[in-house]
A protein has these predicted regions:
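Divalent metal-dependent phosphate-bond-processing catalytic cores, especially two-metal-ion Mg2+/Mn2+ enzymes
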Residues: 1-2, 14-42, 53, 79-82, ...
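A broad detector of short, well-ordered amphipathic alpha-helices
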Residues: 5, 9, 24-31, 35, ...
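Phenylalanine-focused residue identity feature
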Residues: 8, 67, 95, 113-116, ...
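His-Asp-centered metal-binding catalytic motifs of divalent-metal-dependent phosphohydrolases/nucleases
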Residues: 44-79, 87-98
Length: 187
């Protein structure tokens, strides 16, 4: 089985029944990752696998810290032959380190799962996560950030983190769009 096939099976088993909306979002993020495949030459399976797995840490069976990037990555780390690139992308997706700081978990996250040194893959995953609604539909990063703030409140841990990350989220979205335009990739 391919890494992508394995990733879909795992994410579906963890999210489809218990968190169907998260499963829809994860599928939408993975669909976006497939659209970006021409930009990440030779690494498209890593991107798509990380995209479909990025929110598995919300699954009730995996919650340990309540910080989904860390909980999801810790679970993935226990699976033999799990690709370290996928694990680290899940752990650090969408500025997770900023949220980890808000939660007092930055030492654990950085120590266990160092930032992945492939800016294009990191940016591509941020792009896909931040341009996909909770229902798996396409949206703008502005609408997505507003939706997150509306769901979690401005002064919550997530609200504080997303406000800190917001300028960089929008910059990444624009950067990925520009790369896609230059490469003739339709988003």
């Amino acid at each position: 089985m391919t890494v992508v096939g394995w990733a879909y099976e795992l994410a579906e088993s963890l999210l489809r029944e218990s968190l169907p909306r998260r499963w829809q979002h994860s599928q939408g993020v993975a669909t976006c990752a497939r659209r970006l495949a021409p930009l990440v030459e030779g690494r498209s399976e890593v991107l798509e696998a990380a995209a479909v797995l990025h929110d598995i840490g919300y699954a009730p069976a995996l919650v340990e810290t309540g910080f989904h990037p860390l909980d999801g990555a810790r679970h993935l780390r226990t699976i033999p032959d799990a690709d370290d690139r996928v694990v680290r992308l899940v752990a650090n997706h969408s500025f997770a380190l900023l949220e980890a700081e808000e939660r007092g978990l930055s030492a654990e996250l950085a120590g266990e799962f160092p930032l992945f040194d492939d800016p294009l893959l990191v940016d591509a995953l941020v792009y896909c996560d931040m341009t996909t609604t909770p229902d798996g539909e396409r949206t703008t990063s502005e609408a997505r950030v507003a939706e997150i703030l509306g769901r979690y409140w401005v002064d919550s841990v997530v609200g504080r983190f997303i406000r800190r990350a917001e300028p960089e989220i929008h910059a990444i979205v624009e950067r990925v769009r520009a790369m896609a335009d230059a490469a003739g990739v339709m988003l």
